[in-house]
Amino acid sequence: MKKFFSMLLAFVMLLALAGCGGDNSTPAQDQGGSSDAGQTQQDGNEAGSGDAAASLEDGIGDYHIGIVTGSVSQSEDDRRGAEAFQAKYGEDKVTLAIYPDNFTEELETTIQTIVNLSDDPQMKAVIVNQSVPGTTEAFRQIKERRPDIICIAGEGHEDLPEIGSAADLVCNNDFVSRGYLIIRTAHELGADTFVHISFPRHMAYETMSRRVAVMEEACKEFNMEFVLETAPDPTSDVGIPGAQAYILENVPAWVQKYGENAAYFCTNDAHTEPLLKQLVEYGGYFIEADLPSPLMGYPGALGLDLTEEAGDFEKILAKVESALVEKGAADHFGTWAYSYGYTLSAGLAEHAKNVINGVSDITDMDAVAAALNVYSPKAQWNGAGYTNATTGVKSDNVFLIYQDTYIMGNPGRFMGNADVEIPEKYFTVS
């Protein structure tokens, strides 16, 4: 796999560093960022190049952009990213909507929530993040009614070829590369066992089933034990409270069973906070969340008030890192320095704006990268186009992306994962 936009991002990072007076500290050490989300976005406006860079100075014209996310309880970062984009361009230009928490049982409501945005005659783009079941059908209905509306899917829960057939653009976390890199990082930190926590609905998704297959294969390469654990689905009858209670109750037994050198991973956002809370208490490793962010589970697990740091991911990361060090958990917990969900919601909307303004092509990966960097100005990203493991067909509108992993400690450090060459065999593991 080629790092198709590594040179662009190197240039982005160079400009971002120059804007900080040449400071080469990690995000957790650099306290120079603004606590205002808008300021972070303005800093990112300097990060692009060529037409993409120029477009970042442009506002939203006589049209509207809609963003659909989950609720704060299900996917807070996704929602906060949408709110940041709306705050930047105005409520009169950006419409936000929330699909039901129990989206699997309320499929028609989910579809209608997305489709309703097309009732606005000035609507020109609809972004859904995460693209839960029903998004594909909603996009098809929108295209039938309003073919002029750009449809962008972030983090698809449906099969990527399927949602790619209805969406103009799909961006997903790189489940293949990350499946390998998470195991590799756990091994480098000293873990001897990897515990994967999920439930049948998630394991039916191609993205998650392929990732877990890659993880299991990578454990063989690094001589680690691989374990599957099942936890309740938060969209089932037990709801989020019941699912979280299960994690809280079972982690101590898992730590006793697998030892303190086991690394854990869960596929659901709602499981993350209780998992982190108990691992900090009882011992273990956590490389990064399913959708990584310093906000994903850490504030609640550590009892942090991040009101003053809101919108400034460098300060958020520093506070989370400091709390972990104080609790004796240094070098055991990681994340992406900038929230994936936050960046994806806001960045894909930024890209849609650039496409509507006529300065970017919808499937130009360099332009997508520049838009993402508006909300993650110092991030090192990598990725590749999606290839169907069964058919071998490569999609021209589905992209897989990931950010370098940051392990929190004293000092913390980036693992250099964005520069690691993934062994070719893992791209056909399924």
Language model segments and positions:
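An alpha-beta-alpha
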Residues: 82, 175-228, 352
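Extracytoplasmic "Venus flytrap"
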Residues: 53-85, 89, 96-112, 127-133
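C-terminal motif of bacterial Sec signal peptides marking the signal peptidase cleavage site
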Residues: 15-19
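Extracellular/periplasmic periplasmic-binding protein-like sensory domains
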Residues: 218-226, 273-357
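Hinge/cleft segment of the Venus flytrap/periplasmic-binding protein
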Residues: 316-430
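Periplasmic-binding protein-like
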Residues: 66-69, 120-131, 149-154, 195-197, ...
